[in-house]
């Protein structure tokens, strides 16, 4: 009887530990747009307003050297971010709507850096230079040589700088391993001279790091052992160059990987890399990350002739490409041929699907049916790139010139605050308990109630 009691107590303790550990993991912000790239952290107690000039509700501010549009990531009390530093590349960003596809004409020596800060104080804990040299690929005027967001967990920090390599550090900044993939041609597929730099962020799940490399030649999806860097699998993809980050979803307990694409949008087995389903069509420059809902995966894209938004079943198998004129089939719950965003990852929040377009138009949709809840324009801002995030009924959306719109999660557009940061902002914010972090061209701000 005593042994049985000990056994039962042990099982209860084990379950409570695992539940606590899982909850802890879900409240971290470990990759682009947080846990599973969802962009949501409720019960964070964030302020409704702040002022970067007076310091109202600004907990701290620090200058980030160089240029980067990598979002901050957070694990426990540490915040991590990357940048590419050059003494000669002073072009900065070119905000606004324009059709110029030419890259920035700069061939100066850069240093690719990873920074670790105390999230509470802004104190720099460590800094590492991953590599140094002339970039192998030039950058778009809205881009940098440090576009990809880090992936972190309680032990490791993974940085992917495209043609400059994949790097894994421990959380104290000691290099564990690195990999060189050679030249990854992140270019406009119809104009090879239009080099735009790499931007697909790595994803950590379990014991593996996942990377999606949709490039001009030899596109692939691959998994590497997080501890050693050993290749676990590598799957070829027939795809144009793209800049989208993969995401993790589950189908009846099976862990899968969702990837956006034009010729080969699809799902893959996490363990083997085997393709589970595929679908062609959409915007021919794919950038937004898939968003995971309840038994559905949401995709959007925009460029060329099509700009769809669609909801795909997590149980999809085989080729599920829609025939001409179709908007649904056995695995496509619903789709819209127009309205998808070129740059923005959508936000699924409180049973509403938010799609922000480059000009600041918001489409709020019913995630189950795709029916419009509302469409509205955010203020007078001309251009948006940073994807939205949400907490406690508030949605935070920065425009390119650094104005932050805080709107209510309501059945119609309700603007709570409009806050100028007076500096270009191309980066999705990051949220932790009591704080939200904004990266501008030069600075990183920690915003909290004071």
Model-based region annotation:
Residues 1-24:
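Bacterial Sec-dependent N-terminal signal peptides
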Residues 21-450:
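Noncatalytic, solvent-exposed loop/strand surfaces
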């Amino acid at each position: 009887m005593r042994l049985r009691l000990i056994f039962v107590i042990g099982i209860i303790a084990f379950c409570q530990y695992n539940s606590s550990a899982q909850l802890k993991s879900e409240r971290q912000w470990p990759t682009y747009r947080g846990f599973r790239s969802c962009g949501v952290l409720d019960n964070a107690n964030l302020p409704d307003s702040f002022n970067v000039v007076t310091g109202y509700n600004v907990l701290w501010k620090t200058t980030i050297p160089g240029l980067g549009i990598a979002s901050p990531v957070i694990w426990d009390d540490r915040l991590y971010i990357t940048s590419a530093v050059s003494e000669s590349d002073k072009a900065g960003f070119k905000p606004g709507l324009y059709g110029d596809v030419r890259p920035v004409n700069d061939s100066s020596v850069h240093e690719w850096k990873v920074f670790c800060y105390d999230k509470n104080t802004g104190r720099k804990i460590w800094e590492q230079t991953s590599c140094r040299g002339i970039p192998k690929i030039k950058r778009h005027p809205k881009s940098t040589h440090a576009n990809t967001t880090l992936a972190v967990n309680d032990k490791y920090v993974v940085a992917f700088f495209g043609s400059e390599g994949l790097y894994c550090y421990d959380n104290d900044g000691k290099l564990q391993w690195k990999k060189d993939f050679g030249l990854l041609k992140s270019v406009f597929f119809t104009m090879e001279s239009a080099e735009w730099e790499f931007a697909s962020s790595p994803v950590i799940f379990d014991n593996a790091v996942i990377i999606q490399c949709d490039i001009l030649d030899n596109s692939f999806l691959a998994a590497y052992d997080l501890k050693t860097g050993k290749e676990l699998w590598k799957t070829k993809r027939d795809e144009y160059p793209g800049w989208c980050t993969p995401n993790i979803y589950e189908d009846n307990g099976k862990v899968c990987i969702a990837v956006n694409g034009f010729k080969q949008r699809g799902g893959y087995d996490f363990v083997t890399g085997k393709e589970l389903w595929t679908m062609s069509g959409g915007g021919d420059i794919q950038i937004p990350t898939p968003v995971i809902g309840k038994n559905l995966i949401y995709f959007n894209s925009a460029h060329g002739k099509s700009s769809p938004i669609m909801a795909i079943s997590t149980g999809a198998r085989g080729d599920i490409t829609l025939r001409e004129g179709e908007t649904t089939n056995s695995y496509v719950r619903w789709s819209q041929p127009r309205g998808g965003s070129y740059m923005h990852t959508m936000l699924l929040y409180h049973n509403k699907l938010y799609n922000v377009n480059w000009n600041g138009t918001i489409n709020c949709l019913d995630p189950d049916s795709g029916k419009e809840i509302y469409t509205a324009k955010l203020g007078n801002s001309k251009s948006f790139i940073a994807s939205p995030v949400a907490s406690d009924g508030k949605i935070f959306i920065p425009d390119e010139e650094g104005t932050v719109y805080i709107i209510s999660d309501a059945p119609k557009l309700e603007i709570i605050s409009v806050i100028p940061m007076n500096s270009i902002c191309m980066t999705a914010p990051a949220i932790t308990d009591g704080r939200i972090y904004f990266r501008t061209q030069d600075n990183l701000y920690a915003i909290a109630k004071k």
